[in-house]
Swiss-Prot record:
Its cofactor is FMN; [4Fe-4S] cluster. The gene is nuoF. PANTHER family: NADH-QUINONE OXIDOREDUCTASE SUBUNIT F. NAD(+) binds at residues 61-70. The keyword Metal-binding applies. This is NADH-quinone oxidoreductase subunit F. FMN binds at residues 174-221. InterPro entries: NADH-UbQ_OxRdtase_51kDa_CS, NADH-UbQ_OxRdtase_suF, Nuo51_FMN-bd, Nuo51_FMN-bd_sf, Nuop51_4Fe4S-bd, Nuop51_4Fe4S-bd_sf. Binds 1 FMN. It comes from Escherichia coli (strain K12). The lineage of its organism: Bacteria, Pseudomonadati, Pseudomonadota, Gammaproteobacteria, Enterobacterales. Composed of 13 different subunits. Subunits NuoCD, E, F, and G constitute the peripheral sector of the complex. SUPFAM superfamilies: Nqo1 FMN-binding domain-like (SSF142019), Nqo1 middle domain-like (SSF142984), Nqo1C-terminal domain-like (SSF140490). Belongs to the complex I 51 kDa subunit family. It catalyses: a quinone + NADH + 5 H(+)(in) = a quinol + NAD(+) + 4 H(+)(out).
Length: 445
């Protein structure tokens, strides 16, 4: 396994991490160039210049979609009279197999605070909320302390750095619903409403939280902003090995020797992460399949391990980069059981707002349970494939159901024989008496 040496030039997100895994508080953070990006942004650049710099750097959303952050920011209204605007941080990290944002919030809370400060200035937002997964108790404590430290130091609140810019930041803990990872469901929950996605348009940029212009960004996305402002566009683009700029928190979980999370340049291959960082599979286990970016991404096979971890390459292979935290599957794991477990999670976490998702996902679970018991019926696999089509992109209110069926459709594609093994074999003619199944004879007679 590789010995990682983190430097500001190669690991802009994680170079400040302590070896003892304790949080980096304000004094230490500032001694390591902390809030330098914020100083440059607030005292030397206009909001539009910051938006253009982030756009030119090529920063893409790190929550899974990979949409241009600068372009998303530029969708906010230019009308100066719309002076009540919100910046929301999506920290509702509940995707199974995903744990990258937790590291940043627990150990580098000021990095997120600085990223939100710069972003709020660029968006002309006067208030921000970190919508945090309720189970992340340590992250909540550390973020609130970091906000208090920043406020006392004049880095949050009124007239920040003497610029006349005001920005307040709050932590809001969720109530344990996965669907709040969808930005409009998050907004509804923040407002105290039922956490279901909203119809678009209007988009949050024009009518979001409390009907005001709102921008929602992922934790890791916001944490990339300070380094871009501190070091420049060209530097940010050059630390990548791909046309996707910058670095990414990537990892491997499953029954590997060293499961974990590492900051790596885009373009690093999945095989390199698995073998050089995660140490390969545990002794006695053979690699079988993997999901590139969390539970809601399509399975790929060993033949895909040499793909670079970047949005386009993984997309062309038939999956999504997602969160870039891959999950390894070994030869002892039955794909029907694994997919059934995933689909149970997605069915339970459906908000129930639209019929295809509300009824379709539990139906898939019912069929998978039967296949797992060896009691599947002829046509069950075809029904599952049909469900995948009916729950695909554009067929439901949000992206929950399309993501939920990605592991199902890909598991059938690559491991169909394991699903076929769960089909109950029909009686042959030798097992019939006058065309009647033996267990039905008593009912007939």
């Amino acid at each position: 396994m590789k010995n990682i040496i983190r430097t500001p030039e190669t690991h802009p997100l994680t170079w400040r991490l302590r070896d003892d895994k304790q949080p980096v508080w304000l004094d230490e953070y500032r001694s390591k160039n902390g809030y330098e990006g914020a100083r440059k942004a607030l005292t030397g650049l206009s909001p539009d210049e910051i938006v253009n710099q982030v756009k030119d750097a090529g920063l893409k959303g790190r929550g899974g979609a990979g949409f241009s952050t600068g372009l998303k920011w530029s969708l906010m209204p230019k009308d100066e009279s719309m002076n009540i605007r919100y910046l929301l941080c999506n920290a509702d990290e509940m995707e199974p197999g995903t744990y990258k944002d937790r590291l940043l919030m627990e150990q580098l809370p000021h990095l997120l605070v600085e990223g939100m400060l710069i972003s709020a200035f660029a968006l002309k937002a006067y208030r921000g909320y970190i919508f945090l997964r309720g189970e992340y108790i340590e992250a909540a404590v550390n973020l609130r302390r970091a906000i208090a430290e920043a406020t006392e130091a004049g880095l949050l609140g009124k007239n920040i750095m003497g610029t006349g810019f005001d920005f307040e930041l709050f932590v809001h803990t969720g109530a344990g619903r996965y669907i709040c990872g969808e930005e409009t469901a998050l907004i509804n929950s923040l407002e105290g409403r039922r956490a279901n996605p909203r119809s678009k348009p209007p988009f949050p940029a024009t009518s979001g939280a409390w009907g005001k212009p709102t921008c929602v960004n992922n934790v890791e996305t916001l944490c990339n902003v300070p380094a871009i402002l501190a070091n420049g566009v060209e530097w940010y683009q050059n630390i990548s090995k791909s046309k996707d700029a910058g670095t990414k928190l990537m990892g491997f979980s499953g029954r590997v020797k060293n499961p974990g999370l590492w900051e790596l340049p885009f373009g690093t291959t999945a095989r390199e992460i698995l073998e050089d960082y995660a140490g390969g599979m545990r002794d006695g286990l053979k690699f079988k399949a993997w999901q590139p970016g969390g539970a809601g991404t399509d399975f790929l096979t060993e033949a895909h391990l040499d793909l670079p971890m970047e949005f386009e390459s993984i997309g062309k292979a038939g999956s999504r980069l997602g969160t870039a935290l891959a999950m390894a599957v070994d030869h002892e794991i039955n794909m029907v059981s694994l997919v059934r477990n995933l689909e149970e999670f997605f069915a339970r976490e459906s908000c129930g707002w639209c019929t295809p998702c509300r009824d379709g996902l539990p139906w898939s679970v019912k069929i998978l349970r039967a296949l797992e018991r060896g009691e599947g019926q002829p046509g069950d696999i075809e029904t599952l494939e049909q469900l995948c089509r009916f729950l695909g992109p554009g067929k439901t209110f949000c992206a929950h159901a399309p993501g939920a069926v990605e592991p199902l459709q890909s598991a059938i594609k690559y491991f169909r024989e394991e699903f076929e093994a769960g089909i109950k074999q029909p009686f042959s003619n030798t097992h019939l008496i006058n065309g009647i199944q033996p267990n039905l004879l008593k009912e007939r007679w």
